Amino acid sequence: MISSTSVYGLKMQWTPEHAQWPEQHFDITSTTRSPAHKVEAYRGHLQRTYQYAWANDDISALTASNLLKKYAEKYSGILEGPVDRPVLSNYSDTPSGLVNGRKNESEPWQPSLNSEAVYPMNCVPDVITASKAGVSSALPPADVSASIGSSPGVASNLTEPSYSSSTCGSHTVPSLHAGLPSQEYAPGYNGSYLHSTYSSQPAPALPSPHPSPLHSSGLLQPPPPPPPPPALVPGYNGTSNLSSYSYPSASYPPQTAVGSGYSPGGAPPPPSAYLPSGIPAPTPLPPTTVPGYTYQGHGLTPIAPSALTNSSASSLKRKAFYMAGQGDMDSSYGNYSYGQQRSTQSPMYRMPDNSISNTNRGNGFDRSAETSSLAFKPTKQLMSSEQQRKFSSQSSRALTPPSYSTAKNSLGSRSSESFGKYTSPVMSEHGDEHRQLLSHPMQGPGLRAATSSNHSVDEQLKNTDTHLIDLVTNEIITQGPPVDWNDIAGLDLVKAVIKEEVLWPVLRSDAFSGLTALPRSILLFGPRGTGKTLLGRCIASQLGATFFKIAGSGLVAKWLGEAEKIIHASFLVARCRQPSVIFVSDIDMLLSSQVNEEHSPVSRMRTEFLMQLDTVLTSAEDQIVVICATSKPEEIDESLRRYFMKRLLIPLPDSTARHQIIVQLLSQHNYCLNDKEFALLVQRTEGFSGLDVAHLCQEAVVGPLHAMPATDLSAIMPSQLRPVTYQDFENAFCKIQPSISQKELDMYVEWNKMFGCSQ
């Protein structure tokens, strides 16, 4: 049996399927119901009848629009009607009142705001009486126990976004469509939806049949309509004569728990429970096609997605709006870290892999590109939050050093942080993280036993002057790019000895456990400028260690008064930043046999250095390698040579090494040299140290600048300079001479034969 009814002259048919909802809504004709319950009833009717019938094409789009306006009029009339209310609240019996209309047995909520302080709204006084006949004739009976937001055949626990529908104090939600360039939706609700066979023809805005006092008095004027956008769906040229309902904002508090009825801002109903599967959702049209319900703006910035077209646009809009209602559109990614955790279990030594470039593989010690750049970049540790709270009220000298980190201030800058920011990685909770940052951490049985001396190191740190710690950090600890064996020209014999007798026992202490003592001190002697410091940096890079560079001449000339304390602080920080490589240049200044005064500053400095060196050599816990360099090995006291287990001669570069140095230095400039000229340069640089060859190339590169006319050098472009030629090297040979005499070379050879270990 099919029944029909007429609304606004349009016929609306009802199928037997609509009879499956008997007694699902409130009895609107009841005179004992409160306005809150009647409001819920209209919302239930709107959702279960109008929307369902529209979705199943049981009623036309024009009929749906008329019903929507009719229900909105009655809904707003209930809220604005002069009905006696016990309290002025958000239309619930109590603060915990249910939005589905069920009775709540708790006591009424008594807010601080009373009804006397509210401006009365008598815009539709007779709407309740007029709505009884209209609703009863158009809609089937409903049950008051049905929960708002559910539909037949769908679980009741599926929630939908809440759509505010009252203008009297309701809170309008920003529309997703407000930012579309082709659809300028107002912040309020414009609830006109037409079928796809109709077009968007603007209709004249008719005056509201129930104007509010504010509108009638001229205090509140509706905003001018926006310009009409282009038609979305062609095919219908008729003009709608539907009225425009504009309700002003009243003084009722915002309703945050209003059930889903119709959406503010012109947003279509989201895909939810009331739409059966397989039924397409209605297509929304701009607000200017059929004037709808214009609500006062709320001042919030609406979400403005990119422009969408065709049917996929509407589905994406509904999906985005639904996700926003469910709280799935959170774009705050600042609280999440996407860094991949690195494993703490990595082999200490691996055989070389020829498939990896030299810049990344080093000499085969399994050094990754990421960690190798941090090989000897020691830094100050930022205190953890717990340690900051623990030590915030104490003085800097009483601080217990927190864990070690690897970020450092720029070299040479004075730091104001306390010395208490240093500690040994083995005693900190971030020790494993520290070892991950090292390309080849010195691991072995001694690492487990290192915790026994942590307490003594902590006590010494507490008693160390902050100025000395800052001095060591800024002046002695050196950072720079990692150095590979291929970066050092020549010295093949020295490299092989260092690898086999220094690096391998340190990296694989388990394989060399039978040795009485591991070689932890090295003496590099030879002419100046032959690469001794570069070798020290390379050893630190291969070990993944912190590189400390102490100049013996600087201790004597610049810091003689504090040299003893600086040496002590350097070894102390090195123990906190293990593994460490301490490089001491001009060691003959500290260990000279000519120092006779027992209490002189130089004597105290030498005593402190020997004491620290002896501790490193005899301790199985310290992961420290001490490398000393000198150009005057004959001046070292004979009794002190025993402290250096390996004494290696660093000779002048051979012809192959000199050719490599010249090519490397000229690769950054434009030059014009053939193979014969390169061979002549290599031959003429016999007896030159590596530093002398560098000075020669630098002087030759400046030659093209000397040939330029006397103009401003800043205005000269590199392309305007001529290439470097052999003639430039001829001119440079007139200014640069070898800095090493043959007598000195003979002395190095003789001393190496007597005390050296490289042959």
Curated annotation (Swiss-Prot):
Assigned GO CC terms: centrosome; cytoplasm; microtubule; nuclear matrix
SMART domains documented for this protein: AAA
Keywords: ATP-binding, Cell cycle, Cell division, Cytoplasm, Cytoskeleton, Microtubule, Mitosis, Nucleotide-binding, Nucleus, Phosphoprotein
UniProt entry tagged with the keyword ATP-binding: yes
Modified residues (Phosphothreonine): T400
Source organism, top-level taxon: Eukaryota
Subcellular location(s) of the protein: Nucleus matrix; Cytoplasm, Cytoskeleton, Microtubule organizing center, Centrosome
Pro residues compositional bias, start-end: 221-232, 266-289
Coiled coil residues, start to end: none
Entry binding sites for ATP: A489, G529, T530, G531, K532, T533, L534
Gene Ontology MF terms in the entry: ATP binding; ATP hydrolysis activity; microtubule severing ATPase activity
Region feature (Disordered): 89-111, 196-237, 258-290, 339-457
GO biological process: cell division
Alphabetical list of Pfam families matching this protein: AAA, Vps4_C
Composition bias type Polar residues, residue spans: 381-418
Function text: ATP-dependent microtubule severing protein. Severs microtubules along their length and depolymerizes their ends, primarily the minus-end, that may lead to the suppression of microtubule growth from and attachment to centrosomes. Microtubule severing may promote rapid reorganization of cellular microtubule arrays and the release of microtubules from the centrosome following nucleation. Microtubule release from the mitotic spindle poles may allow depolymerization of the microtubule end proximal to the spindle pole, leading to poleward microtubule flux and poleward motion of chromosome.
Protein family according to the UniProt entry: Belongs to the AAA ATPase family.
Quaternary organization: Interacts with AKAP8 (via C-terminus).
Protein name: Fidgetin
Name of the gene: FIGN
